[in-house]
Amino acid sequence: MATEKTPDWKIVDLQWAPDLGPVPVQDAMRPTRESQGEQEMIARMWVMCAIQMQDKLCAAKCTKQHFERYRSWLTAEYERFKQPGYPQVPDSRELVDMSNDARLAAMNKLREGVKNTYMWPVIEGPWRVYDNVVDIVEGRVKLVKVLLQDGLLEKFYDWANGLSEVRPLFNRMGRSNSSLRILEIGAGTGGTTARALEGLKSDDGELLYSSYEFTDISPLFFDAARRRFEGYSNIEYRALDISRNAVEQGFEAGAYDLVIASNVLHATPCLVDTLKNVRLLLKPNGFLFNQELSPPGKYVDFMVGLLPGWWLGDADGRAEGPCIPPEEWHRRLEQAGFEGLHAVGFDSDPPYYYNANMIARPAVNA
């Protein structure tokens, strides 16, 4: 039986508009820097934190089912650490064999080395999970509160969004239609919003959009976002749960030229249903920009696997975690009435990439 050939996404060209012609993916969504060293440091930190907290997590009394899922997942990873060739941490077996004191000293050395640098949030994040895990699973503190302290979560998202340069993508789109109606899903701390808005300016500072709707499932982030983006006009802040029909939540069907989603669509129970809800919002010639986690490593699983939403995809073929590779996004987009993936750009070469930046548009007559 013949197997379907996986497309070489990096050489796909994207036609924005007749006046622009083809936009090569590597020009519109390119890595900002060589990140191999960063990714290896991050992987080493989370693996050491995972090993260090294994015993106390096993002894803790989990108060929620998703905490039990996390504990089972981490126990399985711990067994993999003992085998040679763990991704990005080839000496994981030696890290397991270290004494607790030596491992703790190595963890603190990494933390000290990145203080006051852009790497601080991605090294401090795993430490906070390790340091607070018993209080989290026994219900005395919430993970989100732990990660929000000192602006860590916002700085973490800024680091992740800074791995790839997508501002030219939004700028080219804005130049082809300076009256864009844009909706961002799950905008959260505004890391992607900031880069989109920076790109949606002409050379003389004119805004290249008519409206920008900043949405999130909760209004928790809205006050901070209003302060962060007070210098921009025509931004509206609204609550939206994209796992539900958006029209029933007061949004207009077929109204948006561009929908932006950064690491949010995976956190829903059924991706095809969610993508159908996204398609409902788009104009027939509109675009979805979907930035999604696609890392070979398990850093993100370690960081946010204690959140209930991380395990929502059990019945959707995502029992081991919510993230899927671009080939699978392509298939599910087609099932939801899109043409599939129009283009994909990664923020680094394998196996050191973190995000996949994906563009899709509605299928005609779907």
Swiss-Prot record:
Its EC number is 2.1.1.-. Induction: Expression is induced in complex medium (Czapek yeast autolysate medium) supporting calbistrin production. One of its GO terms (biological process) is methylation. Transmembrane segments: none annotated. Pathway: Secondary metabolite biosynthesis. It is an enzyme of class 2 (transferase). It comes from the Eukaryota. S-adenosyl-L-methionine binds at residues 189, 216, 245-246. Gene3D superfamilies: Vaccinia Virus protein VP39. Keywords: Methyltransferase, S-adenosyl-L-methionine, Transferase. Methyltransferase; part of the gene cluster that mediates the biosynthesis of calbistrin A and related compounds. Calbistrin A is a secondary metabolite with an interesting structure that was recently found to have bioactivity against leukemia cells. It consists of two polyketides linked by an ester bond: a bicyclic decalin containing polyketide and a linear 12 carbon dioic acid structure. The polyketide synthase calA is probably responsible for forming the decalin moiety. Belongs to the class I-like SAM-binding methyltransferase superfamily. PANTHER family: POLYKETIDE SYNTHASE 37 (PTHR45681:SF6), POLYKETIDE SYNTHASE 44-RELATED (PTHR45681). This is Methyltransferase calH. It comes from Penicillium decumbens. The lineage of its organism: Eukaryota, Fungi, Dikarya, Ascomycota, Pezizomycotina.
